[in-house]
Regions:
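The feature captures the conserved acid-bearing segment of alpha/beta-hydrolase catalytic domains
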Residues: 23-96, 101, 109-121, 129-133
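Residue-level "edge-of-site" marker
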Residues: 19, 105-106
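Short glycine-enriched nucleophile-adjacent loop
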Residues: 1-11, 17-20
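Hydrophobic/aromatic-lined pockets within catalytic cores
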Residues: 10, 93, 97, 147
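Solvent-exposed, polar/charged alpha-helical surfaces in well-ordered, non-transmembrane soluble domains
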Residues: 3, 7, 83-86, 90, ...
Length: 149
């Protein structure tokens, strides 16, 4: 839901933190209760540019600064497969105009087995080794990301 809110309302939010989510637009459907197995299982693969087009179309003409974003995903998630983290990375680096390669990688960050890929001060992605869809939220990490520490 964080991906959807930040993609749809970039003028309302300053930052977001998505845990075990999917890229904005991945679950696009007919507007009713939609579950997309192709999205959930990581079979919807797009380029960063394609994802950016989807986000941009949610708020045509938006000229302001997009919210900063952090995403987390477990490598053992069988509800929303780990490929979805890669799609979120492609999406938000493109939307925020960041390089698609991290500027640094932090191993055992936040927890043992968690690797955080930092793409600048506006986007980071964390992969949690062996963690399922029930990924443990780290409130302090989120508050720090929001600058509320």
């Amino acid at each position: 839901m964080t991906n959807v809110l930040l993609g749809s309302y970039p003028d309302v939010f300053a930052a977001g933190s998505a845990w075990a989510g999917v890229a904005f637009g991945c679950f696009a459907g007919n507007g009713f209760d939609v579950w997309s197995d192709p999205c959930a299982t990581g079979k919807i693969i797009k380029t960063g540019s394609e994802w950016k087009t989807i986000v941009d179309s949610a708020y045509p003409g938006f000229k302001g600064s997009r919210p900063k974003m952090q995403v987390f995903h477990g490598t053992a998630d069988t509800t929303l497969y780990p490929q979805n983290l890669q799609e979120e990375i492609k999406e938000w680096t493109a939307v925020l105009g960041l390089p698609s390669t991290p500027v640094c990688t932090l191993t055992d960050h936040y927890e043992k087995g968690w690797t955080t890929y930092v793409y600048g001060d506006r986007f980071q992605a964390t992969s949690a080794q062996g963690v399922t869809h029930n990924i443990q939220t780290k409130e302090t990490v989120v508050l720090n990301w929001f600058g509320l520490n």
